[in-house]
């Protein structure tokens, strides 16, 4: 891959594998099938809409991951907006750990000017009236889901190449939190799996 080509990337805080992740993924998939909306892996965006050469992205993400310890994120209320990428989601409770992680990412990428960080975990992306989103939340008992799970452990940052078309999102690499920030081998990208593989937990 030509690392001089600029692309848009997103860094996600990804839940540890286990029953909670599987239940969240199944919920996203079920809503997707019923309402013909995109499916995607459960995640909390740490920072998005970052452009630059891919190798630089990997080096900076390694630095970020080395400065953040594994953490738990606690679920709050179910919310929805008229924005496509904030259609229906679980609010993540603000803590020093989650705000600190976002601060590290913004500093490394020189994006301190961004609006206040609002951590959340999306369950659906859709263009539909807010009232319909509310009815879907009730239909699937999403507030009960959030309360039952309570919180999830976060053990890695996942880097995705993203665009307005969710179907074209592509997983690039995972970085374990607290890992050593070593130089990235230019040949790291031999695994070309897409985000879709996240469905097979």
Language model feature labels by segment:
Residues 85-87:
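A generic structural signal for beta-strand entry/edge sites
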Residues 155-166:
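Short beta-strand segments and strand-loop junctions that repeat across beta-rich extracellular domains
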